């Protein structure tokens, strides 16, 4: 089950452990990096930090919104298990309605198929270092 958790209630050691163990872990999702890149952030958490999704938070004219912080190329769902389109859709639908505007750059493992979200594709160059060196050559 996916739960919305405010910054003060996030267990940062479990959060960082999830990022470290996830198939698609990136520096941009570690709690210490989020603390530097954005002044406020909350998160969506599945079960006991099996999967997480950071929600950088801003407020303008009394409206809450989530955004892509500077120097953070990719966010989205990070998981210790396989990331399916269904899981990404569940996380996106789990963003609370109090966020009136959402603009996030999802990571390369997140492929939303839900028509109710407006999406655009960008180009990135990513070398997956999970493969052995001989394969990467």
Model-derived features: positions:
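Short amphipathic alpha-helix that is part of the acyltransferase structural core
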Residues: 1-27
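Acyltransferase donor/substrate-recognition loop-hinge adjacent to the catalytic core
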Residues: 1-6, 10, 114-137
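Conserved donor-binding loop and adjoining core beta-sheet/short helix segment
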Residues: 17, 32-90
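Structured helix-beta-strand junction loops
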Residues: 21-22, 39-40, 98
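A short, aromatic/hydrophobic, helix- or strand-capping loop or linear motif
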Residues: 25-34, 103-107
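Short, solvent-exposed loop/turn segments at secondary-structure junctions
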Residues: 58-61, 108-111, 132
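Non-catalytic accessory segments adjacent to catalytic cores
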Residues: 84-124
